[in-house]
Amino acid sequence: MAFATINSSAIPPATPSSIPTIEHAFASEPSLRKRVYDAIGATPQYIPLFEDIARYTSSLLARNATSTAPPAEASADGPAAKKRKIQNGDVSGTPQSLGDLKADAELQFHMRDVSFAMPQRKKLTLEVTAGGGFLRARNQTSKEVEFGVPVEKIQHVLCLPVPEKNQRQFNFCVIPQNGDGINTPAGGEAAPESIVWTVADGPPKSEFSINGQAVAGGAGGESAEKVVLRVLNDALTQTKVIRPDDREFVSAMPEAHRKGEKAYHVKAFRGSKEGYLFFLSTGILFGFKKPLIFFAFENIDSVSYTSVLQRTFNLNIMARATAGGEPQEFELSMIDQADFSGIDAYIKTHGLQDASLAEERRAKRYNINGKTEEAAAAANGDETAEEESELQKAQRELEDQEDEEEEDYDPGSDGDSDGSGSSSDDDDDDDDEHQDDEDDMDEDEDGEQDLVAAELGSQAADIPEDQV
């Protein structure tokens, strides 16, 4: 009898083949459900624990199902996952404007079959609504507005040649407020995304309309770039479209894929991400991959160089949000040494190497609103010439101040001396340093006379020699 009792106690209890709570929690995960049952079979004493885990999982699934909208169905235009990246289609990060963004409105301009690269990579219809409303992109199959931005919230618009393409193309980059990669929205809102689309050189190939007048593709003779540029400049109120300028920067290396054409870009890396730098009249762009970064002059604290080697160098940009806060450091690496002199000239022209001028740049807030292209170009030229002289003056004063505060005097410097005589006297001291004490005393007297002459300048000629 005792033998039978011992043997029966050694037999493990039967594992339930189905537990309702586990079946419900892992209904969509059969492989995970099987692993749970296998674990229960090995350790049946933990059945209550697995049931508690299953109940908690079911509650999480129910909570998520009620708090989120149902996922969009995949269509011929792309998977639903990509669509959900743009929350409700508004890249400006302002949900209150969604109704207006997608509402039917009179169009100032539209162009079909435009190749967008950001925030989605697909062909869409570009639209600009009348009255300075919205710039938006519409799906050509479903006719739904995919994304857009209020025109009044556009901070920068750039028109740049696409690098390293056999056929000439232009990228239009629309950067919303707080979407430049440096400034961020208040209140923890998601940063808006930039909008980038490409147009080929030459007349538009697809139908477009301006102020309700339809134009067939290829008609009119005006290039697609000029058409879009004109429409945007007419619609924009706070800025104008910025293009590369020979007076700002031209790469030392011509465009590799289009012989005889100037290149306005410089290849660089940010971490492992390859991109292109454009040095423009209002700031520096790093693109064209997500996320775009635009360093407006008013956001740049200073620019310096690191890892200057025989073939490459790095560019370090300290940038600060317009609202203030701590500066952020951005390192752009592996820049070709051939472009060093051109980049250095650009940086010095705009005083970007000098952190002491950062407040002045922020106060200036480069603004070309309301100017024609010709007037803006002339004004920018005059401002640059005037700014150069002021920057050079500030730089000289800063260098003189540093020389005065330096403890160890450097005979090779151009700054003020500590009473050791002029540069010619210093050379004499080096050559005659082993002469007797009388020669040293004579040289000290000459040094004192030269110091007086240096301090008084032209007035020293009016003082009798015996009084010097």
Curated annotation (Swiss-Prot):
Acidic residues: bias regions: 399-417, 424-449
Pfam family, one: Rttp106-like_middle
Region (Disordered) residue spans: 67-99, 368-468
InterPro entries in the cross-refs: PH-like_dom_sf, RTT106/SPT16-like_middle_dom, RTT106/SSRP1_HistChap/FACT
Compositionally biased residues, Low complexity: 67-76
TM spans (from-to): none
Protein task: Histones H3 and H4 chaperone involved in the nucleosome formation and heterochromatin silencing. Required for the deposition of H3K56ac-carrying H3-H4 complex onto newly-replicated DNA. Plays a role in the transcriptional regulation of the cell-cycle dependent histone genes by creating a repressive structure at the core histone gene promoter.
Protein name: Histone chaperone rtt106
Organism: Aspergillus terreus (strain NIH 2624 / FGSC A1156)
Gene from which the chain derives: rtt106
